[in-house]
Amino acid sequence: MSLRKIIHVDCDCFYAAIEMRDDPRLAGRPMAVGGSPDHRGVIATCNYEARAYGVRSAMSSRHALKLCPDLLIVKPRFEAYREASREIHGIFRDYTELIEPLSLDEAYLDVSDSQWYSGSATRIAEDIRRRVARTLHITVSAGVAPNKFLAKIASDWRKPNGLFVITPAEVEAFVAALPVARLHGVGKVTADKLTRLGIETCLELREWSRLALVREFGSFGERLWGLARGIDERAVHNDSRRQSVSVENTYDTDLPDLASCLARLPELLDSLNERIARMDNSYRPDKPFVKVKFHDFSQTTMEQAGAGRDLESYRQLLGQAFARGSKPVRLLGVGVRLRDLRGAHEQLELFPPK
C-alpha cells in the first residue's frame, strides 16, 4: 500500500474556546459550557482552568460545582459552534477534499495527494493551525501520521495548541512503548482484561499470536493484533460533496468603512477565480455570495440567485451585507455556491431507461 499522510485536527476545549473568544471576561477563570445544575445538567466541555480542578466533559454540572465552587457554567450556543466549525472546514478544504468529520471540533484529513508545501503534511498541519488561530482566534491541536489510529493519538500528545508528528520510520518504536489503554477501541473493560493478562504495552501485546488474541477477544483480537504493530488501513471517508468555494481574509487592522471593504474586493475575486479554475468539471458555479465579519465577531452573509460573478455584482452584495452592520470589518469573504453535476447525474441514473 502506498504511503499515506493523515492529519487529525482537534480543537482545544472548542465550545469553551468560542465562549471565551466572544466574551473575554470568561478567560482566565474556571468556566464550562453545559446545562443547569438545578435541572440535572451535564458539562459539555470546560476550559483548562476548570480541568485543573478535575472538571470533565459528561460530568454532572452539580458534581462539577462541588469540585470547583467558583465554576461559571454558561449555556451552549450551538449555532455559534456550527458556524465556527464551518469556517474551520473551509480552511481544511483548501488542502484536500478528503475530510472525515468526527464532530464539530474534530476531523481527519487525508493529504496524501495534496500539492501544498510540496506535499509536506507537517507544513500543511502547521498552516492549518496558524490560519485557524488567526481567523477564528481559537487554538487547535494536530497529529500527523501514516494512518488514522496514530494521527489521533498524535493530536492528543501535545495538547493544548500543539503539533506532534509520527513519521513512518518512527512508527515501530513509538507503538512499542504505547500503553494498550491508548489503543483505538480499548475501553475500560478491555483494558482491565489486558492488564489481568499481563499486557500493559503494545510491545507486550505483540508477544501474543493473532489466533490467541482472537480466542481471548473475539473479532476485536484481530484488530488488536494490527494496532499493536501500528497497522490501520481504515480510509478517510468523505461522505459529502462540496457545496461552495470561497476565499476569506482576516485583516490585521479593521476596515473602517464600506469604501475600504470595496477596495479589497478585486484581490479577493482574483483568488476566488484561481480556486474555481482548479476545480474539476463535476461542479458548476451557481449563486455568488459575500461574507462580512464585523469587529465584534457578529457576521452576515449575502447571496443572490441569478447574479453574475463579475466585480460589480460582488460590489452590490458587499454593499448590502455591510449595511446590515455598518461598523468596522475584520474579515471579508467572497464565494460561490456550487451545483453538483455528478450528484445530479447519479440521481438520474437511479431510473435507467427501460
Curated annotation (Swiss-Prot):
It is an enzyme of class 2 (transferase). Keywords: Cytoplasm, DNA damage, DNA repair, DNA replication, DNA-binding, DNA-directed DNA polymerase, Magnesium, Metal-binding, Mutator protein, Nucleotidyltransferase, Transferase. Its cofactor is Mg(2+). SUPFAM superfamilies: DNA/RNA polymerases (SSF56672), Lesion bypass DNA polymerase (Y-family), little finger domain (SSF100879). One of its GO terms (biological process) is error-prone translesion synthesis. It catalyses: DNA(n) + a 2'-deoxyribonucleoside 5'-triphosphate = DNA(n+1) + diphosphate. The active site is at E106. Gene3D superfamilies: 3.30.70.270, 3.40.1170.60, 5' to 3' exonuclease, C-terminal subdomain (1.10.150.20), DNA polymerase, Y-family, little finger domain (3.30.1490.100). GO terms for molecular function: damaged DNA binding; DNA-directed DNA polymerase activity; magnesium ion binding. Coiled coil: none annotated. InterPro entries: DNA/RNA_pol_sf, DNA_pol_Y-fam_lit_finger_sf, DNA_pol_Y-fam_little_finger, DNA_polymerase-Y, DNApol_IV, IMS_HHH_1, Rev_trsase/Diguanyl_cyclase, UmuC. Binds 2 magnesium ions per subunit. Residues 6-187 form the UmuC domain. Its main location: cytoplasm. It is found in: Cytoplasm. Its EC number is 2.7.7.7. GO terms for cellular component: cytosol. The record marks Y15 as: Substrate discrimination. Mg(2+) binds at D10, D105. Poorly processive, error-prone DNA polymerase involved in untargeted mutagenesis. Copies undamaged DNA at stalled replication forks, which arise in vivo from mismatched or misaligned primer ends. These misaligned primers can be extended by PolIV. Exhibits no 3'-5' exonuclease (proofreading) activity. May be involved in translesional synthesis, in conjunction with the beta clamp from PolIII. Belongs to the DNA polymerase type-Y family. Monomer. This is DNA polymerase IV. The lineage of its organism: Bacteria, Pseudomonadati, Pseudomonadota, Gammaproteobacteria, Pseudomonadales. The gene is dinB.
